[in-house]
């Protein structure tokens, strides 16, 4: 996993960066890698949970139906599918039913965000969702309580399937990123600072769980931004994606943030915003790259 993320980091931030920023990104990458390895807390590899594989594949399909079939935004579709999984798990909690459903559903939904310009045929994306569910079940005892694990796992699933797509000649040219205006950059910064705080409070203080804590506000924000008048010249999808991505920070468990959760959440949200501004991969549109 660390190797794949290193390639992702090099592609997204280091390659093609101005000389003045190369050292900054290189040093930051080393810090991130050290922290990643230090806090991995690897347990034994888990067994492949086939229900989790099926749920993740089904979730990816659900996002495809909403985005490619119903023209919903990728953020709204992903949050809706994730919220459905979270609600199902919450509804069965009292009777100990449907436990463990939310995580593979949300993970598969992230894989389903993959652009049609990357993996054109839906079957590739569904396969990526299933692979993400498989990886998630195997790594069930690794990186526990670290926000972003589900998205990272989805990214690994998509990258794995991309290798097959390249071999089959079915790989797309990739999507293009939205260039933020000055106003949008300010909004991304604000959203990236607020989202972790809201997500963490809903997830742990109110006891909704991390999936609902991330998905429910993301649904609301995606709807509100989509309803803004065109005269404001704000692109709702990149802004709502910033909120969704920053919400992964807020999914981090309290014990990982002790004894100063608020400063850490704000610092991580700020770092997320700065990374969002500089993210310029050769191939955009991969599910899980938030």
Where are these regions (language model features)?
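Non-catalytic propeptide/linker segments at domain boundaries
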Residues: 37-40
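C-terminal transmembrane helix-loop-helix hairpin of multi-pass membrane proteins
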Residues: 1-34, 44-57, 72-79, 86-170, ...
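N-terminal, Lys/Arg-enriched amphipathic/low-complexity engagement segments
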Residues: 61, 65-68
